[in-house]
């Protein structure tokens, strides 16, 4: 039996259009207080990214994105579960019922944190720029997550969809990411990801995580809000949580429309040879299985071209 839970993993707030000089004032002040460090920069030093340290409670990260000559911005990355519970648990997700006013709390924390500084952060300037809707699938330890991830990766997709790879065989086996116009779908082995960071999930759980990261334009369209500004961030999170199932299920159904038992190629061949008694049907099934397998490995397009979708019933 598959146990699944759905919730929200990460949200982001963003203040855009800030000049290089105005951001430098903030950076200098935080450096004096030893509350900031340089995360990365380009070779010309015209683009820098800073993260704060020991400024906010666990669950809030402030990231300054400084660019020249283009304007930069300030990004707040929030883990609602960590913030509301006071502790970081890798596999846990946030549900709006845990703290219905979590975003109002975040805005107050941001405003009050810098009350004594010469510069201010106006919460009214912050927009809800990203929401990560998430599913955790708790599977039995006998299930090979890399095989499920492979099926997702080679599922049908549009030509305009970009498939990200990590250029690392192990990471590519345990995760993949697809980028659409204003959404990103990430599927990965949660235990593998956490282990890479030197942590562990509880009870050696075999967790397949599916994340749908929605930019502002995407979630506004999904909720049919157009350009409304009279709705609170907490209300947006609640409505997205209510639609979590439909939104993620749409992408899962599109990538993997088939149902039933999924097997590696060699095991599938043996199943067909042992269980399909009619020679002509067995021959056709083995033929299509071989064609699909070759298509997914030699062409790199999964099931997107050449052959139409086929389903077998055994």
Where are these regions (language model features)?
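Structured, helix-rich domain cores that form ligand/interaction pockets
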Residues: 1-296
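Helix-turn-helix DNA-binding helix
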Residues: 298-304, 309-314
């Amino acid at each position: 039996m598959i146990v699944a839970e759905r919730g929200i993993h990460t949200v982001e707030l963003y203040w855009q259009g800030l000049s290089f000089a105005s951001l430098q004032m903030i950076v200098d002040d935080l450096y004096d207080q030893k509350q900031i460090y340089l995360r990365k920069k380009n070779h010309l030093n015209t683009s820098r990214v800073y993260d704060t340290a020991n400024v906010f409670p666990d669950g809030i990260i402030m990231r300054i994105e400084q660019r020249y000559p283009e304007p930069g911005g300030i990004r707040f990355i929030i883990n609602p579960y960590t913030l509301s519970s006071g502790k970081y648990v890798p596999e846990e997700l946030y549900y709006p019922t845990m703290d219905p006013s979590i975003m109002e709390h975040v805005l107050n924390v941001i405003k009050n944190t810098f009350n004594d500084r010469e510069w201010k952060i106006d919460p009214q300037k912050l927009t809800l720029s990203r929401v990560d809707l998430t599913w955790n699938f708790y599977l039995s330890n006998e299930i090979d997550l890399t095989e499920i991830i492979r099926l997702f990766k080679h599922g049908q997709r549009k030509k305009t969809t970009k498939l990200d790879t990590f250029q690392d065989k192990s990471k590519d086996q345990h995760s993949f990411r697809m980028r659409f116009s204003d959404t990103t779908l990430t599927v990965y082995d949660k235990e593998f990801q956490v282990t890479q960071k030197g942590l562990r999930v509880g009870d050696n759980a075999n967790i397949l995580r599916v994340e749908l990261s929605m930019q502002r334009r995407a979630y506004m369209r999904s909720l049919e809000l157009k350009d409304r500004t009279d709705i609170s961030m907490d209300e947006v999170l609640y409505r997205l949580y209510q639609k979590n199932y439909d939104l993620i299920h749409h992408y899962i159904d599109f990538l993997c429309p088939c149902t039933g038992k999924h097997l590696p190629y060699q095991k599938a061949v043996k199943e067909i040879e042992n269980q399909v008694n009619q020679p002509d049907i067995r021959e056709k099934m083995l033929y299509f299985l071989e064609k699909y397998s070759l298509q997914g490995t030699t062409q790199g397009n999964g099931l997107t071209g050449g052959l139409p979708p086929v389903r077998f019933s055994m």
